[in-house]
Amino acid sequence: RFATSTTLPIVLDSTEPAVLRAGLEHLGGRCVINSVNYEDGDGPESRFARIMPIAKEHGAALIALTIDEEGQARDREWKLRVARRLISDLTTRWGIATSDIIIDCLTFPIATGQEETRRDALETIEAIRQLKSEFPTVQTTLGVSNVSFGLNPAARIVLNSVFLAEAVNAGLDSAIVHPSKITPMARIPEKQREVALDLIYDRRKFDGDICTYDPLARFLELFEGVEVKSNRQSRAAELAALPLTERLQKRIIDGEKNGLEEDLQEARQAGITPLSIINDHLLEGM
């Protein structure tokens, strides 16, 4: 039923070879296996070695995590080292096309306050940038929402969205993310976006050993007591306060359809022709 309801490849999420084989045998078309890695090495008894013949037999693409025998790769050089090993192994030993390899450089929470997590988002973004430079045809993916773990829902949406935008700019091809947990960049207030960027790139400021600006502390302040609903209501109020023609453009930019029909009726009542609404106002927002 799944195979006939979409033209997109279905992702089978398991590290157990028997589960993957059962899924592949019941699905028509090509699938994506999530995932392979070197957590228990690449020897004959490793999960990697047991999954690959199944993937090869069924022509599946593969999500490959930057995890090796030492653990989950945190800094960019470690991520790149594991990624290069995966790509080399998958292409030379197993004959997998680079376009069928989807590298996950891993996302870690950056709001824990622990020193060792401060640069995790930056390291992931830069690893993606370098990886796409070295292997342009290799695909990349990330589980985006891990980056904001521990924050309140409103803060998570903003951090997820800004992090995703930065990763895409660095070359990210796809993402594992719930659509309700991100928002268009145009909807994010400038101050929230700036501090989120400071947090992602660890732009702390110091006077000697004293931290004079901590983006994490500032980010927490910005969202103290803020709920997703109140954040949306605030944006709706700001939108409603704009002049009609600016409001029409802003609705297009933000992808905000709630209230659009009323604004169009108001524009017609104000004597603006349908053609003018489209050419002079709606198209301006595209």
Predicted regions located by residue number:
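ATP-dependent carboxylate/acyl-activation modules
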Residues: 1-9, 17-104, 108-141, 145-285
